[in-house]
């Protein structure tokens, strides 16, 4: 036997002897099973020690032999010796005991791993502890391998109890961490397991760090894995980025020591697509092409590849030219082409790999451009250039003379007006003063330092923003610093702001108005010229000069100047983005009347109406000039609307951009096209003001050009007012808001859009993905995850810290302020609702404490009490609920059709204060008997709240989830549709998820909201308006139709009003034609149905037409009317079979669409004979289970008939009804086509002779007023019917209905 094998056998024998001595010292021996391998010389019997507790009086044995330390380490680490041959494995457990120095016992701290913006903190690691330093009461598995002959020993598959390893010791560091392969987005590496594992290695943590950003990947280890080399590929990395990689092993208890750090840079990625800016004919055989450098590339651009081919052919020619990343544009001439041919050209950039210099990384190709080569094109281009120059010269001369003429006209008008009007009066409708400002083409790419700033395509903007966020937002810092440095210039003076008499008009000393763009006030009689000052500047919008006026929050001394500016500049919209007081400091003074009328200088301001919403308030103000001579066809009174955003936090930026985007869109759209600029102000008129203006401009740029250029536009408008977008945080918020706007699209939907989108599954799926994009981290739900609070949570829905409801804390009791409840906003208030779970037995008092603390007088309970886990949590008549501070008593109970109302009173124990509470219990929400019941329930809740509106509405369902949030959303959207005529389902759903993640489980939850909204009646009257009376009739009550109100008060010319009136008359004519067509259809339908019924009666040996068929027929399309029972007159014959028992069809009442599906399914199955067996089977099929509609959206749904739960229908005449329905539906389509043609002819006639139609429409309506029916069906775009007659027909045959539900 070779010498090394002798040594290995001796070492194994020595190990067994040492363990036997330990067993003798402790006077206890526990034999273990030995290997039954036939190749083993003899089975081993190894002793182990029993557990020793801390209370044991005997001292543990001390082993200090250095040789034992080394040999035991070899045993614990089975990979210490793997060479050998011929041995089969033995694996045995050893219970070892030694004394451990308490000074060396340190708990291994877990590394603090943050998100993409946090760094890994260096933690103290325990020192290397020899493997012999093991404690009692811990089982250490020791795999043993023997050697004999020339065979290789293997370890057995036994699974030792690794969980018993001492928690104080961790695995050593992984060894030989090596990089194997690198690409642009991945790094492949390998490493060996730790030498000292100290337990079963459950896996590895792979940390990848670049700058301040740390990511971690988990590599799980298989249960019985004995791999000596681990491979892993890091993916989704950034191209051309330096990464540092560290690997740590971990067991089920602890994380091990870090490996040696290794640094690696990823490879470059492909550049983005260049943009071809010029493609022209150079000669009849050559083309000139010019392109712009890609806006995104890594390291450098080494060359370009130009692909050319004849249009329509597959073969192409590649041309490669060297390039430099410093060149913004590149041009070349493509020669040797064919005359009179079309060529397709595209360009791509490429760079060499930094990992493998021989490898080429090709970027994206530009969009293909097509050009035609023509003879003599080289002669045409100089002629075009010369003509262009001559044209420019002519235009320049024309502009100069035109300007000179305009100046003369203005001077003559000025002298004439001074002569005609007294000097003590102002002058009406003077043109606003728009001074000349430096013009900058901000859409052209610019070079700042070594970087190019250009517009970004919409489809790549999210990626662009993500790159700016990388490395701790370093990209934003560089861009904002470039803007700050460039906009500091002495070339833009502010001399008027520094005038001694004007300094007091500045709220802040450093916020002044540039002279070249400031707003000039018209001088008053006897006023000095330098007193035309106000701290305000004209600011450009997107493709519109002087679209905005940016100004500071008015001071009391400047109220008169502010309102003079509003009047003189024809301002219709004021945007205010600040509160009067923030953080205890005065930010703006109240420059409008609190109620009634206030006079500021020569302008009188009257508050007409104030509409308060959750995030902003709209005020309607009437302004009147007191020193203006009223001229013919001119008003001295105008309406101005103030949009006041009230939810901008005192410090920083809003939590989410959706409310801000909605505010920007609505306030900007309210400004009439022919009105003056929008006045925007915050406190200083620079930070939030600039954010608003940039958002509005970029939203319009996205809509018109599908590109975004925040950098260029902000750089442009900063030359018009200083410090716009005042902080880097606001600059970042701008980009994040635009990313959200691009992802969500237009979310304010009209009623007809809600109807269309409720059946658009791809749209709902995409919305759902965007809604649940936010995933909370531990810091967001820290209170909910505390151990003391975990028993207060029913499920996995937790409140976010910033929106959770707080209880009055109890001194010295941790977690006493926690309840699983969240604040949700409604249409009116930010804290309109409290959504919470069904109280558990140990949280009932917490629930009533919450009601008491927050003065909630309305509780809506949506969970049922069927389950024992969801028991009653309110007091009954005999047993009140008492706490240290209050007592809850039951008052009375009222049963309604779909819900139960209970009244309670909460009395204070310390004083006489008491709080009345009404609980509305509706366990069937939202699957009530019919849609009208849904809205009746909502109206009842809001009527209660209008009477007692001191606190929020508490909404309770089982887990505080989808049911409760659906109620909040529907309640808010119903008011929004009444006020704004739009519904923003996406905004409510996403903000609810952000405040209470997990409430939406699928896109079907979002579909439920759309389904309910689609049946929203128009007379909910949920708004409780606070309109103030006025002295003129046209604005007695303000309405959301801001444009029409502005038009009626002199801010828009009369021809616009006339156009609106003409359009209204046209709509009346169309409605009249629709009514006539519907009457004709009804008459034809009745005649056809009578004829069909008569034919059926003659051919079918039936005693009578079953009257129970009438309700079913009323659910068919509008052309199918109920059959008249009087039409069946044929007497029965002797051979008439016995009538079949009536077939009961169960109609679930979950939604009208489900009802339509069941009716249509019944009609579809009518072709097959129905037997009593099948009828009974159909009758008993799960009457309470909702059915998912599978029919196309064209199937008509009848809200008025959805309340019928069950119908009894016989089989007689069923085939005839089905055939007639198909024929009549085809006839209806023909009638609708004829109606559309008549409407088109009417439109053409109106466009030709609008005045004639205007005069005749009144007579036309009067002549037909007496002939119109009292209730005629209205056919909508989706073939829905709303007809009281149909409902009455169904009610007439109520005796034929078999109500089952």
Swiss-Prot record:
Region (Disordered): 31-63, 1092-1199, 1257-1281
Record field: compositional bias (Polar residues): 1092-1106, 1150-1161, 1264-1273
Catalysis: reaction(s): O-phospho-L-tyrosyl-[protein] + H2O = L-tyrosyl-[protein] + phosphate
Low complexity compositional bias, start-end: 33-63, 1107-1130, 1162-1188
Keywords attached to this entry: Glycoprotein, Hydrolase, Membrane, Protein phosphatase, Repeat, Signal, Transmembrane, Transmembrane helix
Membrane topology type: Single-pass type I membrane protein
Signal peptide: 1-28
One MF annotation (Gene Ontology) recorded for this entry: transmembrane receptor protein tyrosine phosphatase activity
Glycosylation sites: 33, 176, 212, 278, 322, 336
Localisation per UniProt entry: Membrane
Tissue expression profile of the protein: Selectively expressed in a subset of axons and pioneer neurons (including aCC and RP2) in the embryo.
GO biological process: axonal defasciculation; defasciculation of motor neuron axon; motor neuron axon guidance; neuron projection development; signal transduction
EC numbers: 3.1.3.48
Residues that span the membrane, as ranges: 395-415
GO cellular component, one term: plasma membrane
InterPro entries per UniProt: FN3_dom (IPR003961), FN3_sf (IPR036116), Ig-like_fold (IPR013783), Prot-tyrosine_phosphatase-like (IPR029021), Protein-Tyr_Phosphatase (IPR050348), PTP_cat (IPR000242), Tyr_Pase_AS (IPR016130), Tyr_Pase_cat (IPR003595)
Segments in the Cytoplasmic topological domain: 416-1301
Active site, per annotation: 682 (phosphocysteine intermediate)
All residue ranges annotated as the Fibronectin type-III domain in the record: 66-165, 173-269, 270-376
Stretches with biased composition (Pro residues): 1131-1142
Residue span(s) of domain Tyrosine-protein phosphatase: 476-741, 764-1016
Extracellular topological intervals: 29-394
A matching Pfam family: Y_phosphatase
Family: Belongs to the protein-tyrosine phosphatase family. Receptor class subfamily.
Physiological role: May play a key role in signal transduction and growth control. May have a role in the establishment of the intersegmental and segmental nerves.
Protein name according to UniProt: Tyrosine-protein phosphatase 99A
